[in-house]
């Protein structure tokens, strides 16, 4: 109940948030297409049980040097609520939190051409080798943090892993149609794998 009540303030379907979403989509099309190479190390260890896969780090994530780095991205908040912990703030805290809860974090792509943070603009994708993690960790389930990540995984990675991916809603601030309550409910599915 505590998590539910705290989450009420995070529903981003307010008028102001809708305007921010529209503004973000507008500006993403003004940005130039650029070639992006993934530079973050995957987060995992030999006790990781679930693998959370995004598509590629956003410009803001690349700026701060870590996964889901946009201040309005709800990834770390929803995972911490699902795990019953405080939201990790620093890069070190996020790594410690993920490993303590048997969560591996990476992205589907090692590189691509993309316009801003707009996954729909991705061209010439180059996939990461998921077996880097799978051969070391007892991964029981793989989750995509958005439809594009799931689509790319199924196209480029599934043939090598043989593990189906479960698609969860995006935690991106651009995904304002999904409330925090809906995110929390969707991401709660990981509990059965990490306990």
Where are the regions a protein language model picked out?
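Internal catalytic-core helix/loop-beta-alpha segment
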Residues: 100-149
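Short, surface-exposed acidic-centric catalytic microdomains
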Residues: 60-121
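Short histidine/acidic/glycine/proline-rich micro-motifs that form metal-
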Residues: 66, 139, 172-174
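Short, hydrophobic/glycine-enriched beta-strand segments
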Residues: 49-55
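C-terminal capping/extension of enzyme domains
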Residues: 25-49, 71, 118-131, 154-195
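Short catalytic/ligand-binding loop motif for oxyanion handling, primarily in non-cytosolic enzymes
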Residues: 59-62, 113-116, 150-153, 173-177
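Low-acidity, Ser/Thr- and Arg-rich intrinsically disordered low-complexity segments
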Residues: 4-17, 21-28
């Amino acid at each position: 109940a505590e998590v539910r009540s705290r989450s009420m303030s995070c529903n981003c379907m307010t008028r102001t948030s809708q305007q921010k979403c529209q503004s973000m989509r507008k500006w993403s099309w003004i940005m130039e297409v650029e070639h992006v190479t993934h530079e973050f190390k995957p987060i995992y260890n030999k006790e990781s049980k679930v693998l959370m896969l995004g598509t590629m780090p956003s410009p803001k994530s690349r700026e701060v040097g870590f996964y889901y780095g946009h201040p309005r991205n709800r990834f770390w908040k929803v995972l911490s609520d699902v795990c019953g912990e405080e939201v990790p703030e620093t890069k070190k805290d996020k790594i410690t939190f993920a490993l303590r809860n048997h969560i591996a974090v990476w992205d589907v792509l090692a590189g691509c051409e993309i316009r801003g943070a707009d996954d729909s603009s991705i061209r010439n994708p180059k996939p990461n080798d998921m077996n880097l993690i799978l051969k070391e960790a007892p991964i029981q389930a793989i989750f995509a943090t958005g439809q594009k990540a799931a689509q790319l995984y199924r196209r480029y990675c599934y043939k090598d892993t043989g593990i189906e991916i479960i698609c969860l809603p995006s935690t991106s601030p651009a995904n304002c149609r999904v409330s925090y309550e809906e995110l929390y409910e969707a991401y709660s599915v990981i509990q059965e794998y990490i306990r």
